[in-house]
Amino acid sequence: MHATTVKNKITQRDNYKEIMSVIVVVLLLTLTLIAIFSAIDQLSISEMGRIARDLTHFIINSLQDWK
């Protein structure tokens, strides 16, 4: 009986940790999206195109250096 109770408490704790992890990830993604849309709202379209092009080049160069 005691082993079952301990196992149930461990399972509940693991479930709690998993749920909290999901909540943290969702909050971080939400904040990231808010920041991205705020930046897009403040910049003009031409600036966003230049930033996207520069970011793409940076990512491609980083991936090539990583190999």
Curated annotation (Swiss-Prot):
Predominantly, its location class is: membrane
The record's induction entry says: By acid stress, via the EvgS/EvgA system.
Kindly state the subunit structure of this protein.
Interacts with PhoQ.
Q: Which residues lie on this side of the membrane: Periplasmic?
A: 40-65
Q: Which family does it belong to?
A: Belongs to the SafA family.
Q: Which Pfam families match?
A: SafA
Which residue ranges does the entry give as Cytoplasmic-facing topology?
1-18
Q: Which organism is it from?
A: Shigella flexneri
Name of the molecule in the record = Two-component-system connector protein SafA
Q: Which GO terms describe its cellular component?
A: plasma membrane
The task this protein performs is described as:
Connects the signal transduction between the two-component systems EvgS/EvgA and PhoQ/PhoP, by directly interacting with PhoQ and thus activating the PhoQ/PhoP system, in response to acid stress conditions.
Protein's membrane topology:
Single-pass type II membrane protein
Q: Where in the cell is it found?
A: Cell inner membrane
Q: Keywords for this entry?
A: Cell inner membrane, Cell membrane, Membrane, Signal-anchor, Stress response, Transmembrane, Transmembrane helix
For this protein, the parts annotated as crossing the membrane are 19-39
- Listed InterPro entries: SafA
